[in-house]
């Protein structure tokens, strides 16, 4: 019986099985940022320990960085202190730090791949929920907490429970105006926000194989929103072509050896899976969330669910809670719901291909007068490339604010926040209560092109209609 990529990579990195039943796993790459890492360095300092393998740890700034004015010192003294603490710790411990002057700063899950740090067959850890993004390369990547960040810094290992593996097979051709974001929202909608608990998700099938690396990253990024700690795609020629020539990618003879390893860790044709889910891509439409979890999603042409339409009382309660918070009426179309803010960016959809796709759609259009629209590149490299192509001008001419790189409005850890009851059409990954800064602010998740359509119309709209897709 063959093995899945997950099992191959796990077995190659397993140090030993602990008395608890967990496995001690060697971590090939450790990515850190300013929010969950300074405290871990402090724990190390208190214990009199040093970073075990500083050459395998890389730091950046993303969560708290202002995207309108990055001049230091930041107005937020707490944020300024966190940046200083991380910089000091990295200097003391010999850890590479991509700060605002490095030219390489950006969201951790965007700079890892673009620098070639993220590689197939690796185990990757980061103190951030969306570390599963790196699984797009055929890596086993997972988010960890601050104490686990400490453990990786001190030992380059983690104690983890082995997961089951679910194969999600997506076949068929996507319709016009349908993107990777729509697929992952549909997967979460079908399987639920807890459906992946205890599983690693392996994404495959002709649809996924036809995706670019950036589309695969969008898909893997939101695995955790469906309860799966790990999500990955088997590496292939698309992966290798993306990686070749990246700053930290292997070179020369090392490249050829790496290719041999990378090819070997792909799932065997006769690999055994604990579960298989099959999805027809042609049936997926542009998808938006209507509630307060990513699983509360519908096609843009559907009506918002009504509590009375379900028989399960707990489901009814969840619907009522979501409708009350979102100020929506069950049984009414989601299309036409007024928005106040539009946000394109985040580790889900803040890459060059995202901005290219939106730019080609919004030319000749203008953001509605009452909408505040932000376009936030995910890294300095993305910003440079987009600006070299003139994409920033397209966004500005359409009425978007073109910002500096950072996590921005994905979460409430920087100045980019919702105010009051504002509703945001967002290309990010979470629509929890208060996620974007205001305790009554509302978030509707969708693809970047759908965000652009909402920005232009001033309300949730079908991008296929707005842009004639």
Swiss-Prot record:
Record-linked CDD domains: IPMI (cd01583)
Pfam family, one: Aconitase
GO BP: L-leucine biosynthetic process
UniProt cofactor(s): [4Fe-4S] cluster
EC number(s) per entry: 4.2.1.33
Superkingdom of the source species: Bacteria
GO molecular-function terms, A-Z: 3-isopropylmalate dehydratase activity; 4 iron, 4 sulfur cluster binding; metal ion binding
Binding site for [4Fe-4S] cluster: 347, 407, 410
Substrates-to-products reaction catalysed: (2R,3S)-3-isopropylmalate = (2S)-2-isopropylmalate
Pathway where it operates: Amino-acid biosynthesis; L-leucine biosynthesis; L-leucine from 3-methyl-2-oxobutanoate: step 2/4
Key words, A-Z: 4Fe-4S, Amino-acid biosynthesis, Branched-chain amino acid biosynthesis, Iron, Iron-sulfur, Leucine biosynthesis, Lyase, Metal-binding
Enzyme class: lyase
Family classification: Belongs to the aconitase/IPM isomerase family. LeuC type 1 subfamily.
Assembly and binders: Heterodimer of LeuC and LeuD.
Entry protein name: 3-isopropylmalate dehydratase large subunit
Organism: Sorangium cellulosum (strain So ce56)
Gene name per UniProt: leuC
